[in-house]
Amino acid sequence: MPERFMRGIEVVNGIVWGPMGLGLLFGTGLLLTVRTGGFQLRRWGYWMRHTLGAILTDQSVTAHTAREEQAISQFQSLCTALASTIGTGNLVGVSTAILSGGAGAVFWMWVMALLGMMTSYAENVLGIYYRRKDPAGGWRGGPMYYLRDGLGGKPGRVLAVLFAAFCALASFGIGNLSQLNSIAGNLNAAFGVPEAVTGAVLAAVSAVILLGGLKRVAAVAERLVPAMALLYIVGALTVVGVHITAVPAALAAILKGAFGLRAAGGGIVGYGLSRAITWGFKRGAFSNEAGLGSSVMVHAASNVKEPVQQGMWGIFEVFADTMVVCTLTALVVLTSGFVDLDTGRIAAGAAGSALVGLAFDAVFGTLGSKLIAVCILLFAYSTTLGWSCYGCKAVEYLFGAGAGAGYRVLFVALMPVGAVMRLDLAWTLSDTFNGLMMLPNLIGVIALSGMVVRITQNYLARKLHGSPAPPLLSAGETI
C-alpha cells in the first residue's frame, strides 16, 4: 500500500478520532443533555420502566409482528442493535483502554456513555420521526432520512449520501472481515479449528440468516444476544465475586486515575489525566456506537409509534453495552491481580490483549480461556449480523431496494476471506469509515436538536401531565 495513502489515512483518523472528533462527540451529548433537562438522569426510573421493565411485563414489546408485516418488535430492534454494539471491543478494547490510559480511563468511559445515552436517544427519536414507508409496507429509516428530509436542500442530500456511502464501506471492514478474523484466530488458538473451516462454516450459516432479510436477522438476534450477554455476565460476575475484596481498591484506582492523582508507573504506559480522558472517551465511543448513527437503521424498523419510546431504547442500548458489560470487563481486569493498580504494569508473563482470558483462567482453570473464546465467537458474530443490516440499508438507500440482495451475497462471500487474511489495514480503514460516518450524522443531530426537544416535551406533556396536544409522531407519514 503506498506510503502516502497510509499517511493520509492516519491523518484522517487523527482528526475524526482525535481531540476534534471526540470533542464533537462529547459536545453533542452534552448539548442534548442540557437541552432535554438531563433526561437520561432525571427520568432514569421512567426510561428503565419503559425498556427493561417493559421487556418483563409488556407483551406488546416482545410480541412478534405478523409474518406478512415488514416491521419488527421493539425487543427485536434492541437485540439487533445490541448485536453490533456488544462486540470484541467490550473485552479486548476495555483491557487496552486500561493499559493505555490507566484505571482512570474507565471513569471517562462512563462519562462518555452517560452523554452518549442522549446522543443515541436523539438519533432514534429522529429516526422514527423521519422514517418512511416502503412499497412493501415496511419502514425505511436512519440518518440518511433525517439528514435528507430534516435538514433539507442540497446540504442535507449530500450529507445523507456521504453517510450511506461510508456506512456501506464500514460494514465490510468492522462488520465483516475484521470480525471473522477475530473469530477464526480465537477458535484456532483455543480449540485448534482451522481458520478456513471457521470461515466456510460461518459463511454457510450466514447465508441462511442474511438472505432471509431483516426479520430473520432480528429473529436470530433476539435469541442470540440475551444468551451471549448472560453467559459473559455470569462468568464475569463469578470472577469479580472471587476477587470481591479487591473491588474497593479497583474503584479507588478508577477515581484517582480519572483526575491524574495516580503517578505514572515508569513504564511505557502513562497514567496522566489527558491519557485517561482520551482512552476513556475512545473506548466509550467505539463500544456503544452512539454518534455513529448505525443502529438507527434497525431501530427505525420497529413497530413502535412514539419516537420518544424508541429513543429510550437507544438510552438502554448504551447503558447495557457500556455501563454493564464494559464495566464488568474493567472490574475483571482490575481485580485479577495481573495489573498493578499503583504502577499500571502488567504482571510478568501476562499479555495485555489476553488479560480477560487470564483472569477467567485464574478462576475457571483452562476452561476460562475457552469460555472467553466462545464469548468472542458470539460477540463478533453478532456484530457481523448487525452490521450486515446496516450496510444493506445504506446500499439500498444509494442504489435502490434491488441492490440489497447483491449486497448480501457479496457480504457472505467475503466472510471466508476475512477468516484467513491479515487485516491490519482493514482495522485501520474500519476506524476511518466509522469516523467519517459519525461526522455527517452528528451535524444532523446537532442541527435537529431543537426538533428532538420539541418531540420530547410534547411526549412528556401528554404522558405525564395529560396534555391534549396532538402527538408528534411522524414528519410525513400517517401513523
Spans of features found by a protein language model:
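Extracellular/periplasmic helix-exit of transmembrane alpha-helices
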Residues: 123-133, 237-253, 261, 265-268, ...
